[in-house]
């Protein structure tokens, strides 16, 4: 996060964040995903990790102030930690040091890899999209910003992931109606 790169991700949040308090509260963390993913080096990983921990705590406060249910906040936090950890792990600097042993998912959920559970959560929430639309939209943005989880390493994983993204977008449109799909970086 040394320097901000324009990946178009800010534009991705316009549609949903105006209708979705969860996405609006998560914007700083969602915006950090491409910033981290595209950074070639980071001089102070410990400080970056602490800034993200502090921002996750602010996210939780914003969600509580908005009256969002605890389960939604925890689910969103899990997905955000997983996406941020993956973004860091895929950088030249993130595969060693702070993130290799003490990612955000470990800090907040005492887990080391959420690449499977992220999609299990998506499958569960997809059973009742109207009830879970806020979190489904936030998951959609994590995917649009490049999160791949277990599909990164599976044979034909990217094709499977594209199918998941398409189904998720159709589900969201089914609940929200038509508005232009968000831009993907």
What are these regions (language model features)?
Residues 17, 44, 68, 106, ...:
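Conserved aromatic-histidine-acidic binding/catalytic patches
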Residues 162-185:
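Juxtamembrane amphipathic/hinge helix adjacent to a transmembrane helix
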Residues 74, 79-151:
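Membrane-proximal low-complexity regions enriched in glycine and acidic/polar residues
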Residues 35, 39, 58-69, 82-93, ...:
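Amphipathic alpha-helical interaction surfaces
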């Amino acid at each position: 996060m040394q320097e901000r790169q324009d990946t178009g991700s800010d534009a991705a949040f316009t549609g949903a964040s105006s209708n979705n308090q969860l996405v609006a509260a998560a914007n700083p963390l969602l915006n950090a995903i491409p910033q981290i993913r595209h950074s070639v080096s980071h001089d102070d990983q410990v400080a970056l990790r602490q800034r993200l921990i502090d921002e996750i705590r602010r996210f939780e406060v914003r969600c509580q102030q908005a009256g969002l249910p605890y389960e939604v906040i925890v689910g969103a936090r899990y997905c955000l930690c997983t996406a941020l950890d993956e973004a860091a792990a895929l950088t030249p600097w993130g595969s060693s040091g702070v993130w290799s042993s003490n990612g955000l998912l470990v800090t907040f959920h005492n887990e080391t890899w959420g690449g499977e559970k992220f999609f299990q959560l998506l499958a569960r929430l997809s059973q009742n999209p109207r009830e879970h639309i806020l979190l489904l939209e936030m998951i959609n943005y994590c995917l649009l910003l490049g999160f791949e989880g277990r599909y990164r390493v599976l044979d034909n994983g990217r094709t499977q992931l594209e199918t998941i993204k398409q189904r998720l977008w159709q589900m969201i449109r089914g609940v929200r109606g038509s508005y232009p799909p968000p831009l993907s970086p």
